[in-house]
């Protein structure tokens, strides 16, 4: 019933609770969260990275100028379609979008802080 999710190794798609999708550099990061099982402290999740497809788009036909742009991987769109059938996400309001952007910003801050700390430790070793 969900061939693309099964191809990812998800044997029980009905246990999917929600998912998130974000873009980092030239990759889309899909994270799938499963329903928390009895006795588990945290709900299980899996993460997948998909490279964005690079396309050259004609900007000006007179000068034959092209612009490089990226778009979501076709396989990822098929997976998202299946995930939407399972999770039936609600439409996002402008407030939801603002919260998502702030959440992504906080996540980026943590990633950068962690990387800075890692580099500083490497410097101390020298």
Curated annotation (Swiss-Prot):
Q: Name one Pfam family in it.
A: DUF3461
Q: Which domain of life is it from?
A: Bacteria
Q: Which HAMAP family match?
A: UPF0325
Q: Which family does it belong to?
A: Belongs to the UPF0325 family.
Protein name from the UniProt record: UPF0325 protein VF_1965
Taxonomic lineage is: Bacteria, Pseudomonadati, Pseudomonadota, Gammaproteobacteria, Vibrionales
């Amino acid at each position: 019933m969900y061939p693309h999710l099964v191809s990812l190794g998800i044997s029980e798609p009905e246990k999917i609770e929600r998912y998130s999708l974000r873009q980092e550099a030239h990759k889309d990061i899909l994270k799938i969260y499963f329903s928390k099982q009895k006795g588990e402290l945290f709900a299980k999740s899996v993460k997948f990275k998909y490279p964005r497809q690079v396309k050259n788009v004609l900007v000006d036909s007179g000068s034959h100028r092209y612009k490089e742009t990226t778009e979501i991987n076709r396989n990822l769109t098929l997976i998202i379609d299946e995930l939407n059938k399972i999770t039936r996400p609600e439409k996002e309001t402008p407030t939801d979008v603002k919260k998502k952007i702030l959440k992504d910003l906080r996540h980026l801050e943590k990633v950068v802080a962690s990387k800075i700390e890692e580099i500083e430790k490497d410097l101390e070793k020298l």
